[in-house]
Amino acid sequence: MVDNRTVEQRLAAVAASMTMAGYTMTKADREESRRILRGEVSADESVRQVLADAGRDAADLVGKTAFRRLSELESSRPLTVFTRETLLATHAYLCGDVYPWAGTIRTSEVGAMGLAMCRAAYVDQELDRLFRRIEQSPPSATDREAALNTVAEHWGELTIIHPFLDGNSRTQRYFFDHMLRHAGWSLDWRRIAAAEVHAARYVAAATLDSSLLVDALRPGLSTGEDCPQLPTEPAAVLFHRMMEFRRAHPHESFHKLFFADKQSDKLRQPARDNQNG
């Protein structure tokens, strides 16, 4: 029997993927995910019930099936091989209940966060180039910062390559989470703002600066004492804030400066209120 702490930690990882995909899990969704994570029901059985409801629209259907598949993956044997083939297989598993093209490279142009992604004609070769880098530069098993920097760089590159028409965020969160896990690290997504990670991925994709993604992931590998205040804004808002912050404060930490300033504003607010009163 899986203990409740493990179930909740895995549920947070599933919910993070879905948040990045623009799908907010309902209370009922979370309870169904827990049932799968506990082994009380199989993902296959749960997905069959969803697919039997012909009244759902495609976007809702893809979200409902994907979180169930992610729940099963999170409760199964961890991913230990990080190749083009395992990325495609992961995508096929997560999205194949709805998309017949799941697990295949896109052949049309796409964009996200107002950015044009890699041209479809170059996705194949760029994906091969990235996976050569991943093979040559796995995350450190002894240096936390080095491990985060390596994964953030790879993640930013895969974000701009954007190999699939849909389902990139769900697949990539699982893929890079397990890459860190395989190196001996564990991300606790209860202590990470998924929207911030999502925004920072696109900053890394647009600028080749993955430091904000490192900032966003670091709290999940930190002790409670050094866990910074986490942002609550949507990913699209955070993306623009990050881009502005990066231009104004190059090489500075988004968390250390931006959120420290927000905290200072809160501390100053009572003083202003007292003056007004």
Label for each model-derived stretch:
Residues M1-G277:
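FIC/Doc superfamily catalytic core
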